[in-house]
Swiss-Prot record:
The lineage of its organism: Bacteria, Pseudomonadati, Pseudomonadota, Gammaproteobacteria, Vibrionales. GO terms for cellular component: cytoplasm. It holds the Pfam family EFP. Transmembrane segments: none annotated. This is Elongation factor P-like protein.
């Protein structure tokens, strides 16, 4: 059983009798001497789909749920459901648009390395690769000689995702984006 400080995004925990999937972790350090860090977990209740916020001290011990991961690829859209296919045995996994809204910002037809997270045989989440390649759909014109500058500008991707990119990047450039931090890494 891990401590709160050992938890990561994508883990499933049991808290107050509910099975929760961790979507985001925010760490705060209270002022004063000897204050332990506080971990604010933004979670989704796997039974109801409701959003739940939980707070724990760094040394609180939590129960985790056993999870399995299977490689998947995006298949098609059926109404408001997105269908993903297991790469090994072609099992379909359906997710409603609002369940995977954040992940959809990174999912293009050519994305590789996605996994479905299974808890008790049920698909509960999609795990993205650590980085994805995307083509910039719209950004301000590039500035010649700006490679020495550290200034950035917003760039919009075909999925609607907006990231800050260096000034020398232009519309149509293929870039690599860190999915966890939603930040530009480099040109592809």
């Amino acid at each position: 059983m891990p401590k709160a400080s050992e938890l990561k995004k994508g883990f499933a925990i049991i808290s107050n009798g509910k099975t929760l999937l961790i979507k985001d972790i925010e760490v705060t350090t209270p002022g004063g001497r000897g204050g332990s860090k506080i971990y604010k977990l933004r979670c989704t209740d796997l039974n109801t789909g409701a959003r739940v916020d939980e707070r724990y001290k760094s040394d609180d011990v939590l129960d985790t749920v056993e999870m399995n991961k299977r490689p998947i690829s995006f298949s098609y859209i059926d109404g408001d459901e997105y269908v993903f296919m297991n790469n090994d045995d072609y099992t379909p996994y359906n997710f409603k648009k609002d369940e995977i809204e954040d992940e959809l910002l990174f999912i293009t037809e050519e994305i590789q390395g996605m996994s479905v997270v299974l808890v008790d045989g049920e698909a509960v989440a999609i795990e993205l690769p650590s980085s994805v390649e995307m083509v910039i759909e719209e950004t301000d014109p590039s500035i010649k000689g700006a490679s020495a500058s550290s200034r950035t500008k917003p760039a919009r991707m075909p999925t609607g995702l907006v990231v800050q990119v260096p000034e020398y990047i232009a519309t149509g450039d293929r870039i690599v984006i860190n999915t966890a931090e939603r930040k530009f890494m480099n040109r592809a």
